């Protein structure tokens, strides 16, 4: 099976499931050193193998960064039960948004997501981010902005939500 086929079989996925699927679909010569060829994680990803390599090499680190930031929020149940828009700058494969959704789910919070705005210049990466996020929320709640940061317009990120979460976990890439 392919990564996308394996992903389609998942129900209620978690980041760890995505990493496992990536590892299982990665060519064996890339499994032991998945970071090789990714320029320390800042390379714009160009193909399926690079997407899977990145997930294996850096997925857990992304979770640790996001969880550390979210743990600093007092009373997350009060904050994250409100209508929220997520703007994921340099989203790559959507890992920051996924980590947030995993985090609130682990707390037993059902987030009221108005929309998730995914901003990413790499076409394969933003398409994979969309594929990932569709497993978490409705496709109509996802807005893809395939641009570099300097090209993002106010209309691209406009929202009526009172709570807007900006994730900059991969901002160096864009």
Model-derived segments and their meaning:
Residues 1-37:
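N-terminal auxiliary segments of SAM/dcSAM-dependent transferases
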Residues 40-77:
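Class I SAM-dependent methyltransferase Rossmann-like catalytic core
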Residues 83-92:
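Conserved class I S-adenosyl-L-methionine
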Residues 93-110:
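Conserved SAM-binding loop of SAM-dependent methyltransferases across substrates and taxa
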Residues 114-117:
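Short beta-strand element of Class I
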Residues 122:
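Conserved SAM/SAH-binding beta-strand->alpha-helix loop
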Residues 127-160:
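S-adenosyl-L-methionine
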Residues 162-174:
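A short SAM/SAH-binding and catalytic strip from SAM-dependent methyltransferases
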């Amino acid at each position: 099976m392919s990564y996308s086929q394996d992903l389609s079989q998942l129900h209620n996925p978690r980041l760890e499931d995505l990493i496992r699927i990536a590892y299982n679909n990665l060519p064996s010569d890339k499994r032991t050193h998945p970071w090789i060829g990714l320029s320390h994680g800042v390379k714009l990803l160009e193909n399926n193998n690079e997407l899977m390599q990145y997930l294996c090499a850096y997925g857990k680190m992304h979770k640790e960064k996001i969880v550390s930031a979210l743990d600093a929020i007092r009373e997350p149940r009060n904050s994250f039960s409100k209508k929220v828009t997520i703007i994921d700058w340099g989203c790559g494969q959507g890992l920051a948004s996924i980590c947030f959704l995993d985090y609130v789910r682990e707390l037993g919070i059902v987030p009221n997501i108005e929309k998730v705005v995914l901003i990413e210049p790499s076409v394969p990466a933003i398409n994979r981010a969309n594929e990932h996020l569709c497993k978490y929320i409705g496709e109509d709640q996802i807005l893809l902005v395939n641009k570099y940061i300097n090209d993002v317009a106010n209309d691209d990120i406009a929202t009526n939500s009172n709570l807007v979460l900006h994730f900059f976990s991969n901002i160096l890439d864009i």
